[in-house]
Amino acid sequence: MLRVFVIFSLFIAAINASGEFTVLNRPKAISFKGNDALESHYVGDVLYASMGNAVSGDTNWNGLTINDPFNLAKGVILVHVQGIGHVTTAGNVKTYELTGSGTDASLNALAAELEAANEPVCDINFEQFDDGVQAWKSCFGDFEAPAAKPTKHLNPSLHTADKQFLQEVGFINSAADHLAEMAKPSNVLMLRVSVDGVAKAHGEKSVAVEEANKLLSAAISRLLAASQKSSDSVLFVQTTEKDVAASRAKRDTIAASTTNPYNLAVYYGSDYPVIFNIILWFMVVFGLSLLAICYAIAAMDPGRDSIIYRMTSTRIKKDN
């Protein structure tokens, strides 16, 4: 029975696991221990807490340990890869399973919270490629970022997805080259790339995806080396999320309206404010009147000549 339960638990974990949370570099002030899986919508909280900030959440994940609260991470670099569950890493790293598909939403919340607190942050998301390029240039400057060289199975002339992926890898390489001289110095740098297009064009288990994995691994290692050279108190994290379709499902659940395609406000006629004011002030006057009547009844003194006292006095005399 125990064996069946263990197998069933592993099966459920395999279904829910959609990626990995890998710590490639950390300052001595913090450490990552244990092997518990991390829910993807808490990724932003983990990064936020690693910089010494208080987080409000109900997670029971205990992988993060703060050894020295006075020398925490001065900077955080995260590379998030969509469309693949694992990116090859080298060296002594700590990896946790990611469950769910809320990494993007968690990173969006982290970026918004940092911006609200006037903390410098560079959030470069290539899901919308043109917006990602503009964000990269605003952070690193108007440099030319040459695309990665094509491989045997990644051909930019045949597949648009291959071309965009090679350009994204090129931006990671250029980020490593200009990390020490950023146009917008930031404490948090987030780079989000995608292998989803390559996987759809060639297949999830194709050689092209393996080559994309190697290119990403080399580019991330290059950025890691640049971060270690610039500072020894940088937390460098790599996250992956394979189930991209599930993360986008919420956006597609509500179909576009055919009667109101521009999402305009509901139109009200010219009689609406008149009727609204009549009802509003009637209810106000009615409420005040009712309050006054209740107060008057409560404070009323009937007096000795009232029927209440006369009936009471007569009954007392009769009883005697």
From Swiss-Prot:
Modified how: Proteolytically cleaved by a furin-like convertase in the trans-Golgi network to generate N- and C-terminal fragments. Cleavage is reduced in the fat body.
Effect of residue 251 to A: Prevents cleavage
GO biological process, one term: positive regulation of Wnt signaling pathway
GO CC annotation: apical part of cell; apical plasma membrane; axon; cell surface; endoplasmic reticulum membrane; external side of plasma membrane; extracellular region; Golgi membrane
Topology, Cytoplasmic side: 299-320
Chain ranges for the short sequence motif Mediates retrograde transport to the ER as given in the UniProt record: 317-320
Assigned keywords, A-Z: Cell membrane, Cleavage on pair of basic residues, Endoplasmic reticulum, Golgi apparatus, Membrane, Receptor, Secreted, Signal, Transmembrane, Transmembrane helix
A GO MF label: frizzled binding
Protein origin, superkingdom: Eukaryota
TM spans (from-to): 278-298
PANTHER family according to UniProt: RENIN RECEPTOR
Role summary: Multifunctional protein which functions as a transmembrane receptor in the planar cell polarity (PCP) and is involved in the assembly of the proton-transporting vacuolar (V)-ATPase protein pump. As transmembrane receptor mediates fz/PCP signaling through interaction with fz and stabilizes asymmetric PCP domains through its interaction with stan. Also mediates Wnt/beta-cat signaling through interaction with fz/fz2.
Name under which the protein is recorded: ATPase H(+)-transporting accessory protein 2
Organism, as annotated: Drosophila melanogaster (Fruit fly)
Gene that encodes it: ATP6AP2
